[in-house]
């Protein structure tokens, strides 16, 4: 490994120190549900499958200076595998996003499942979007990709 080395008296001696970083003040907000986080790893003693489960709840927050803009977000993620059979690996994720202001609300739920066989990676995904509790958009994907050395 050959790395460049600067000689003494190089241009760095003439450089000025960086100034303090600038940034906007945090937004004023009202928290109506605190955020939460859970993370666990389990082993099914009968099947031997190892599962990692992560739950992220970003809470419920209303931004005071933005006309009551309210935001909620949760992510529920599972990753599992059998140590002796990596082809049984599975990723299962559900994300929920919700936004509202006054008498308007919109939310989305996405669910993605990734599995594999000896020859391909399979992806199943679903999306549901609601406006004021009415479903306004749905879509489903069913895809398969060659493993290509994976």
PLM regions with names:
Residues 1-150:
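Glycine/threonine-rich phosphate-binding loop and adjacent beta-strand/alpha-helix elements that clamp
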């Amino acid at each position: 490994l050959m790395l460049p080395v600067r000689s003494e008296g190089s241009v760095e001696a003439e450089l000025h120190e960086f100034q303090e970083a600038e940034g906007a003040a945090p937004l004023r907000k009202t928290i109506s549900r605190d955020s939460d986080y859970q993370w666990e790893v389990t082993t099914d003693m009968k099947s031997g499958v190892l599962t990692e489960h992560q739950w992220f709840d970003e809470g419920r927050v209303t931004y005071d200076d933005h006309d009551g803009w309210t935001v909620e977000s949760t992510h529920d993620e599972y990753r599992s595998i059998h140590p002796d059979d990596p082809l049984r690996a599975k990723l299962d994720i559900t994300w929920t996003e919700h936004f509202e202001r006054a008498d308007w609300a919109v939310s989305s739920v996405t669910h993605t499942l990734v599995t594999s066989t000896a020859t391909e990676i399979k992806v199943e995904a679903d999306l549901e979007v609601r406006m004021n509790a009415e479903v306004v958009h749905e879509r489903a994907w069913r895809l398969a990709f060659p493993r290509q050395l994976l």
